[in-house]
């Protein structure tokens, strides 16, 4: 029979360890295969006979090169030789744990050994001989010989995965529901069966309705079911007692589906359902192995990693379900937190980020506005995706205002929707529509609960359940799971539970075995500080000319490949504690380790008493890390090619996920070299990687800073060379080149280039022109010249974008208009690292900083940066004075947010005292890890130029907070922070200082 692997999982018992495969046959039938799960050990071949415990099997690995990867540090160029030996090794498998005196390759997971030992792709398709299987009943079979069973791999075939997407609502009186006294009011399900058929329905708690409401429900013919067996899944809403509702949920969750998907359900929804079921009935959600030998109760287990590096120093905890039935329980919240960098990870913010489109106003009435979205309004195809979400949505966000849906019409290509939008609109206006959660107050709905409220809530709950399905599809989670399992040699059920240091172990183990290499350590891993990538200080604040952006392609992976950086290729590290010894050692290193076979990398010393440090790598025999990286990059290129040639959307999505997974994995290798708990840890390699990266970015800047174009001549600022090794290929390369006359076009004057900023792997190059067509042409020309004439080996750059009206606030903080590099490409406003992208900044601050940046951009485009500052500061002072006197903006515009924590090392630890005072006076306490809002409030009075102890004016703001008559917003704090950011956008420090002293009685803090 032909099988497609869907998920590998283990039993939970300790007596007999089995590994199970959930697979789908070509005819779509579900099949389970069971294998004995062994412990794997690599030992000396001559030591196998000394193992007293019974072994399941042994396999000779043959002679393997055992290499010590301890770091060799010397005071001179006379470096001791690295220990290498060839040993006959053997792989042994046992059903019980062993304790051999000497074990090799012990860092790797048993399940990865299973896949490698039997040459199995966890996500592959295979032709399996039924004669090799023993029938256990219920479509479950036992296999004693996995290698023979999976010997014939066949071309991929696709199947439709079954899934359950759900959301619950619970009655609550305070901020959070209590499982002991708050009932589950609604559970909404979206079920997709293995044939792709979709059902959506909601169960509501009839116990919470009055007799009159139940009579009204009967008149409306809303089904009421007392017994779980009577519940039909074709009704949109069904009323039933809470116990019935919970038992139906239990039945659905115990089904052998491929996926159960929730948003933060592992921590709340699923846990709440099981706890409530246990409390009311004594029953539990239970999972059963396919062979029927083991049944386990639902349980959530937690993995916690404490760190003070995160916001507020709150522990990072992930939640996992202990099921054993082959279903993958997937939490979208944890996945998106791990893979996306967003301002907020609430469902509302994630939905807005994922589902938005441009629409036009078709009709505008006082009570409603009709919007249309299709390919004519949004060419990127967002309208079709938006239409699908609109099918269940009840509210739409229009330019940051949430509007209720009054009427909607949805088809495959687009939609029309009538919204209760109070803004003044005219036919033809273009707006951005976005989806968040429905804008309803659950507290108010529960306080005024009735049948109509219950049905409204059902629509709200169903939309949240369907949002899980929409986000699942949007992020391509299914294909990402499959790609990760195949890449990392891990079961699908755990690929996103592990960190990169564990995920890399499967590919690393496979590569080591293929190259017959074993890496061993005797010393304790030691890690010292080392410098990261080079981030240049901005040379000026505002740029009225175009800036070309050039990025190195995969800089760190290519550094590792070029310099052959790997723990076993490290010849040694030469350190010196005085200048004389350092100079002598440098001469000896060049003589004893000549290029190009060796590369000597000067690095920053590892301790203050040293003055020099040089790491030497042998480039002759390829190292494990470069080979690993090359395999990832080659695999990525292969899947990108397959993606372009794919005939179906499903195949295209699968290959796209594969190439993306290999890209992420390759980029993570550098970080793992510097991570002490990683199997790839190599302090010298990680430090050398960043040192070479800094050299390469400085080389590119040196070559381009001062270059120019005049007619058909391109003059580089310096003649190209190889900054890492003496390279004969660069002999005679000139700094001047002939280029295509079409690049300059009609221009006859000389156009110069100036480096204005650089960050790790990118260079910002200002071009002395403001013609976007010319900037694009010259950028593409420079990309070709750099790659063909300036760079070498595997180093390449990419012309990424043209920035117009660039405003550099400081390192890693800028705002600009970004133009695509292709002719006719569009543009967008981009802010990186600024207050506009932070969620702990007041909306007033964001509004004003965006307004003044736009004003700066317009001024730069019209008149340059000469007299911009005067107009900016004059306008700013007028606006702030007006707001202070008129107080036109509500308190909401001045709210800040912060996560409550107890990290006393944090500079904002006074939040503990603030929250303690609030909790003492309020029933709804702020809990550790919870985000709360606060504002600066003071007594009514005139403007205060000097303020002491700013934090003493903080007040927690909840839904009941109101300003007293003798209180006001402390505008001085907000205005000072805003003005500090704005003056840092301007070049005239003297003028900014005078402005600041006049308003606030102090000098501003200027950042780099």
From Swiss-Prot:
Catalytic activity: DNA(n) + a 2'-deoxyribonucleoside 5'-triphosphate = DNA(n+1) + diphosphate
InterPro entries in the record: DNA-dir_DNA_pol_B, DNA-dir_DNA_pol_B_CS, DNA-dir_DNA_pol_B_exonuc, DNA-dir_DNA_pol_B_multi_dom, DNA-dir_DNA_pol_B_vir_insert, DNA/RNA_pol_sf, DNA_pol_palm_dom_sf, DNA_pol_type-B
Residues that span the membrane, as ranges: none
Keywords attached to this entry: DNA replication, DNA-binding, DNA-directed DNA polymerase, Nucleotidyltransferase, Transferase, Viral DNA replication
EC class (word): transferase
EC number of the protein: 2.7.7.7
GO-annotated biological processes: DNA-templated DNA replication; viral DNA genome replication
Molecular function GO terms recorded: DNA binding; DNA-directed DNA polymerase activity; nucleotide binding
Record bears the keyword Iron: no
Lineage: superkingdom: Viruses
Keyword Nucleotidyltransferase included in the entry's annotation: yes
Alphabetized PANTHER family for the sequence: DNA POLYMERASE CATALYTIC SUBUNIT, DNA POLYMERASE DELTA CATALYTIC SUBUNIT
Family of the protein in this entry: Belongs to the DNA polymerase type-B family.
Protein purpose: Catalyzes DNA synthesis. Acquires processivity by associating with a heterodimeric processivity factor comprised of the viral A20 and D4 proteins, thereby forming the DNA polymerase holoenzyme. Displays 3'- to 5' exonuclease activity. Might participate in viral DNA recombination. Does not perform translesion synthesis across an abasic site.
Subunit relationships: Interacts with A20. Component of the Uracil-DNA glycosylase(UDG)-A20-polymerase complex; A20 and UDG form a heterodimeric processivity factor that associates with E9 to form the processive polymerase holoenzyme.
Name used for this protein in its record: DNA polymerase
Gene name in the database record: POL
């Amino acid at each position: 029979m032909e099988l497609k692997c869907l998920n590998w999982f283990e039993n939970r018992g300790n007596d007999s360890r089995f590994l199970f495969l959930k697979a789908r046959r070509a005819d779509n039938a579900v099949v389970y295969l069971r294998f004995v799960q062994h412990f794997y050990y690599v030992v000396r071949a001559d030591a196998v006979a000394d193992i007293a415990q019974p072994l399941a099997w042994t396999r000779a690995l043959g002679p393997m090169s055992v290499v010590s990867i301890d770091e060799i540090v010397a005071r001179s160029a006379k470096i001791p030789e690295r220990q290498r030996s060839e040993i006959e090794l053997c792989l042994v498998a046992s059903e019980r744990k062993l304790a051999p005196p000497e074990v090799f390759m012990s860092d790797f997971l048993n399940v990865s050994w299973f896949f490698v030992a039997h040459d199995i792709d966890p996500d592959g398709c295979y032709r399996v001989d039924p004669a090799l299987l023993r029938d256990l009943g219920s479509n479950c079979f036992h296999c004693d010989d996995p290698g023979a069973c999976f010997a014939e791999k066949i071309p991929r075939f696709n199947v439709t995965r079954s899934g359950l997407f759900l959301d619950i609502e619970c009655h609550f009186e305070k901020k959070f529901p209590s499982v002991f006294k708050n009932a589950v009011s609604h559970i909404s399900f979206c079920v997709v069966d293995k044939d792709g058929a979709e059902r959506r329905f909601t169960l509501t708690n009839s116990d919470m309705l009055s007799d009159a409401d139940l009579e009204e429900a009967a008149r409306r013919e809303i089904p009421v079911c007392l017994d779980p067996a009577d519940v039909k899944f074709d009704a949109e809403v069904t009323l039933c007692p809470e116990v019935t509702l919970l038992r139906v949920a239990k039945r659905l969750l115990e089904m052998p589906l491929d996926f159960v998907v929730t948003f933060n359900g592992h921590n709340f929804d699923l846990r709440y359902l099981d706890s409530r079921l246990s409390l009311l009935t004594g029953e539990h959600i239970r999972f059963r192995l396919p062979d029927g030998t083991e049944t386990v109760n639902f349980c959530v287990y937690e993995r916690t990693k404490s760190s003070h590096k995160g916001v507020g120093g709150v522990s990072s905890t992930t939640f996992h379900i202990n099921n054993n039935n082959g279903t993958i329980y997937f939490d979208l919240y944890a996945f998106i937190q791990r893979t996306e960098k967003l301002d907020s990870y609430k469902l509302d913010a994630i939905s807005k980020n994922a589902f938005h489109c441009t629409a036009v106003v078709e009709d505008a009435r006082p009570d409603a506005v009709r919007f249309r979205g299709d390919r004519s309004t949004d060419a990127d195809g967002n309208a079709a995706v938006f239409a699908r979400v609109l099918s269940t949505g009840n509210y739409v966000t229009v330019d940051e205002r949430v509007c209720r849906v009054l009427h909607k019409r949805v088809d495959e290509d687009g939609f029309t929707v009538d919204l209760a939008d109070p803004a003044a609109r005219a036919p033809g206006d273009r707006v951005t529509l976005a989806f968040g959660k429905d804008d309803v107050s659950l507290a108010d709905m529960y306080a005024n609960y009735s049948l109509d409220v219950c049905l409204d809530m059902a629509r709200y709950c169903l939309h949240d359940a369907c949002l899980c399905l929409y986000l699942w599809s949007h992020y391509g989670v299914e294909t990402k799971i499959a790609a990760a399992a195949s890449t990392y040699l891990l079961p699908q059920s755990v690929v996103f539970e592990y960190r990169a240091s564990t995920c890399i172990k499967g590919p690393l183990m496979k590569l080591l075995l293929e190259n017959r290499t074993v890496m061993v350590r005797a010393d304790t891993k030691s890690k010292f500080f080392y410098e990261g990538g080079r981030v240049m200080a901005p040379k000026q604040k505002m740029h009225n000319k175009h800036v070309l952006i050039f990025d190195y392609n995969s800089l760190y992976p290519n550094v590792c490949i070029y310099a052959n950086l790997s723990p076993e290729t490290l010849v040694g590290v030469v350190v010196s504690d005085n200048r004389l010894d350092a100079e002598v050692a440098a001469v000896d290193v060049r003589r004893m380790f000549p290029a190009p076979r060796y590369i000597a990398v000067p690095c920053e010393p590892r301790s203050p008493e040293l003055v020099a440090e040089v790491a030497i790598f042998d480039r002759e025999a390829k190292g494990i890390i470069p080979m690993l990286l090359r395999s990832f990059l080659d695999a990525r290129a292969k899947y990108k090619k397959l993606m372009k040639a794919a005939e179906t959307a499903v195949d295209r999505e699968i290959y796209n996920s594969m190439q993306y997974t290999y890209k992420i994995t390759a980029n993570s290798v550098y970080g793992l070299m510097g991570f002490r708990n990683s199997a790839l840890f190599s302090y010298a390699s990680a430090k050398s990687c960043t040192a070479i990266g800094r050299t390469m970015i400085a080389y590119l800047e040196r070559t381009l800073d001062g270059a120019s174009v005049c007619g058909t001549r391109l003059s580089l600022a310096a003649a190209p060379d190889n900054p890492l090794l003496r390279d004969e290929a660069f002999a005679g390369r000139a700094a001047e080149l002939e280029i295509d006359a079409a690049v300059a076009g009609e221009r006859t004057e000389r156009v110069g280039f100036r480096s204005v900023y650089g960050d790790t792997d990118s260079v910002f190059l200002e071009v002395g022109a403001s013609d976007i067509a010319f900037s694009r042409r010259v950028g593409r020309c420079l990309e070709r010249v750099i790659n063909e004439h300036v760079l070498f080996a595997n180093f390449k750059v990419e012309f990424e974008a043209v920035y117009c009206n660039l405003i550099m606030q400081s390192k890693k903080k800028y705002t600009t208009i970004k133009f695509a590099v292709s002719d006719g490409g569009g543009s967008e406003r981009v802010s990186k690292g600024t207050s506009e992208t932070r969620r702990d900044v007041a909306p007033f601050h964001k509004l004003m900083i965006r307004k003044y940046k736009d004003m700066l951009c317009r001024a730069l485009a019209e008149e340059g940066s000469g007299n911009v500052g005067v107009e900016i500061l004059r306008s700013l002072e007028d606006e702030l004075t007006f707001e202070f006197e008129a107080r036109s903006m509500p308190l909401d515009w001045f709210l800040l947010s912060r996560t409550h924590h107890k990290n006393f090392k944090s500079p904002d630890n006074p939040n503990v005292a603030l929250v303690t005072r609030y909790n003492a006076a309020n029933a709804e306490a702020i809990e550790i890890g919870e985000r709360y809002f606060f504002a600066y409030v003071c007594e009514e009075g005139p403007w205060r130029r000097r303020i002491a102890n700013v934090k003493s004016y903080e007040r927690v703001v909840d839904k009941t907070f109101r300003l007293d008559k003798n209180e006001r917003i402390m505008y001085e704090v907000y205005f000072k922070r805003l003005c500090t950011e704005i003056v840092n956008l301007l070049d005239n420090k003297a003028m900014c200082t005078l402005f600041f002293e006049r308003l606030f009685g102090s000098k501003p803090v200027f950042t780099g």
